[in-house]
Amino acid sequence: MIKNPNPKFTFTPSKSRRVFCLLFLGAAAAAAIGAIASSRVSAEPSAKAGAVTRGGQRVGDNAFHLGKIAPWVTEHTADGQQAEFFVVLADQADLSGAANLPTKAEKARYVYSTLVDKSQTTQEPILQWLRDSGIEHRSFYIVNAILVKGTREIAEALAARPDVARVEGNPVIHNDLPSPGPVEESPSQPATIEPGITYTHAPLVWALGFTGQNIVIASADTGVRWTHNALKPHYRGWDGVNGNHNFNWHDSIHDSVGNPCGNDSPFPCDDFFHGSHTTGTAIGDDGAGNQIGMAPGAKWIGCRNMDGGDGTPARYIECMEFFLAPYPINCTPNEGDPTKAPDITINSWGCPPVEGCSANTLQAAVEAQAAAGIQMVVAAGNAGSPCSTVEDPPAIYEKSYSVGALTTGTDNIASFSSRGPVTVDGSNRIKPDISAPGTNTRSCSNTGDNAYTTASGTSMATPHISGAMALLWCALPSLRHQITDSRDALNNAAVHIGSTQCGTAGPPNNVYGWGRIDIANAVGMPSPTPSPTPTPTATATPSACGPASPTPTATVTATATPTATATATATATATATPTPTPTSTPRPTPTPRSQPTPRGRPTPPPRP
């Protein structure tokens, strides 16, 4: 087997690589789903590739065929240029059968096998033509598509096939990530829970013993500094002594130049700060007073899908495949194990159509995760305050749980938070779905194992909701992996905030969605009225998440608010709709939109 100099375009694993992977997977997994076809041949594409004829007519001359090709592809293959593009097949998998399966493991296995079977039975004729023509390519299964590097003639030849639905670009997307504030080491201030965490009423849920135990949250971002003191204890690959990154980490960055994490990092590494920060807000707690995370009892895994903030649809899809069925380091999706899939994913990134990202490219992958019982939580975007600025995939999709940002400690929408309705796809869908604190959020930095920084953005609001979902599923296991019912539970329990800026007041509306997250209300507890800047302390007795109702063992005291004693017992009734706290309809208070600074390249942690 020829060595592949560019892992972006992969081969069927060599014999030695198969043996390596089988050591992890065992004979049962080895006998499972067959290889996902992908190959690369070093030769340049054959000149005859674009001269294929059918019935004496040169392929690609027909306007219908050319209409399948996205404008980005046409532009970037002009004058003989080569570009990367997706060949999306017309025959996509039907995953509706997963809805009738009772457990996450059954859903995930069904979705994985259905998708892989569909890709194998439909892609082979195209793959064979690409191999014969010496054209670089890689197969994907979560979207039945093939990534190709080729010329305009190759794109036209593929578009002419009746089994091809469209040819879409793989542009480099420059995410406008928030800028970090000053970095602090070993903060000396009294131990407190972060104000944004308190404002969601998460500590009241902790007091019942529900901290997210047995829930796994996945980070799709710039990577994660896994050795950080607030993250390492919560990494699924850490057993207290050693780190095991198999099934717990994947790097989709294969061809970066000068990235501090390099390419194909075999261990979690963050090349900016963004991924460590968002992961910390979801699950972070160093055990020494830095209570920065919503669900400190949950575990995390990760996949780097951005190179210092720059992503591509292929990188995004590669990470979504890894989350659907994680696989060991140095292995391929063929060795995936869907039973190791996370429960929830954090997605503080976007794929703007204005940069060439098709509104359709990622949709099938998002829907596949939902069918498998994985909740994809997505940042609404930082293009506010005009209406219809929720315009980037994946935030625009129905199956994405899209999050707006509040000015922390208030019920005012942040000025930068994107608004709906979604018009880019013609749906007029109400977005965001829900809102959470997203300004001056303190969490992990990637510059050191005891370093913290602050940042603002819908990126920061998103992990609050990922953590809230983990707490919900921990407290009410009957809702676990029931995506629609779980979202309804959080939406109905939210503090509804009316706004007519971009449509009717709702709820929901196109500014706040259903309103501010209130996780205590969602699990059936009465919630106190928070102060603008609470500084609570809490001590929770951990318990295994399950159907039994735990006995409260802690009192949560919030400074400058009435003392709330956790005496309510969480119930597992998913049908009751909690009564929302009555609120007035505030006018959004404008706040200055922070401008990103040039992305730094901090030194990554030492290789374990």
Place the predicted regions along the sequence by residue.
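Ser/Thr-rich, Proline-interspersed low-complexity disordered segments
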Residues: 43-48, 527-607
